[in-house]
Amino acid sequence: RAGERWRGEGRDWRVQDVLAWVTPWLDESARNWLASLDPRGDLPEIALETESGFDTYAVTARLHGVAGRSTHGLPGFDNLTGLLTFSPERGQLELDSQRVRVDTAGLLRLPLDFDRLHGTIAWQRDMDGLRLDSASLEMANSDFNGRFWGSVTLPDRGEPVLDLRGHYQDVRIGREQ
């Protein structure tokens, strides 16, 4: 403890255990959102910093094999590895994952399986909703290699807005049997 600042660190936690611990401090909206996401997986390292109680906080967590269901217009995922940093207003996920499954929640007929998923996704909450941005998200599997960038806006009311661009390489096109 330094003045009104606190810092805590932990190792080898599970996502489920951390959520059980923090859930009582979350408002009902956040509890419901996290419950529908149903996150699970391992947190080899996690750090929490606060100022003035928990009004202002920042979390940094190393992720390993993290999974969650698709919800609130966001895709589901399985086996994410990387670094997550967030505060009440914003966050960032630096991905460095292998053998990842992404469930697009009906946007595509089948989930997407990637041999590699690498890049950064940042988000920021404002009065109107949630905005996700990525300068580069690289993915590869046996059917293609691709690099994408852009933004997704998830308004509290109305339809999501996507502004995505990308390049495909090594695309394998075949007939579904």
Residue spans for each PLM region:
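Extended amphipathic, helix-rich lipid-handling scaffolds
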Residues: 1-70, 82-84, 89-90, 94-177
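Short consensus segments that form the blades of beta-propeller domains
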Residues: 73-74
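Short coil-to-beta strand junction motifs in C2/discoidin
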Residues: 78-79
